[in-house]
């Protein structure tokens, strides 16, 4: 595996992005892997590595770069703990348009890297970023061939850019969750 942490130009500055892909056999399809609210941490890097080990060029951007935050550390369950409050403040500082502008920079970076096949793009978002994965697929249907929202939040809102309004297709379910089995 080839791993690097690079600064990628975005509209509002540079986002520190963890990039990982196989050493050989490229160019590799691109996956934009959007973080969850607790920010970049080793668990997410490990998940990116696992995706890359299946033949993908994975980009894990720091969405909190505007605030100068890279990692938050452990988030205690206490809702009044300062670390949890900071996490929610950072999470609420983002919106679909901001993250889509970041994605433009990420896709431009991938286009310039011979290890990446930017004609085949997928995206995955966890929790707060599920909406970003769905929105990126809706905004770039010719380029983003698959999107996954894993326990995504804010997928259906009253906002005009709500992912449920812009998605071409949506599927939900779980083999083991009785709630989604019934749906």
Predicted regions and their residues:
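N-terminal cap/leader regions of alpha/beta-hydrolase-fold enzymes
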Residues: 1-183
């Amino acid at each position: 595996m080839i791993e690097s942490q690079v600064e990628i130009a975005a509209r509002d500055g540079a986002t520190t992005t963890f990039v990982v892909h196989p050493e050989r056999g490229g160019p590799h399809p691109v996956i934009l892997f959007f973080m969850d609210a607790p920010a970049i941490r080793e668990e997410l890097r490990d998940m990116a590595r696992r995706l890359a080990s299946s033949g993908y060029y994975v980009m894990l951007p720091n969405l909190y770069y505007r605030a100068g935050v890279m990692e938050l550390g452990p988030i205690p369950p206490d809702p009044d703990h300062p670390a949890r409050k900071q996490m929610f403040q950072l999470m609420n500082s983002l919106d679909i348009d901001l993250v889509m502008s970041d994605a433009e920079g990420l896709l431009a970076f991938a286009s310039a890297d011979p290890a990446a096949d930017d004609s085949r793009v997928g995206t995955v978002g966890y929790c707060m970023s599920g909406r970003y994965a769905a929105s990126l697929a809706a905004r770039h249907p010719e380029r983003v061939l698959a999107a996954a929202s894993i326990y995504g939040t804010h997928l259906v809102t009253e906002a005009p850019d709500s992912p449920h309004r812009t998605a071409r297709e949506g599927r939900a379910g779980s083999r083991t969750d009785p709630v989604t089995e019934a749906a």
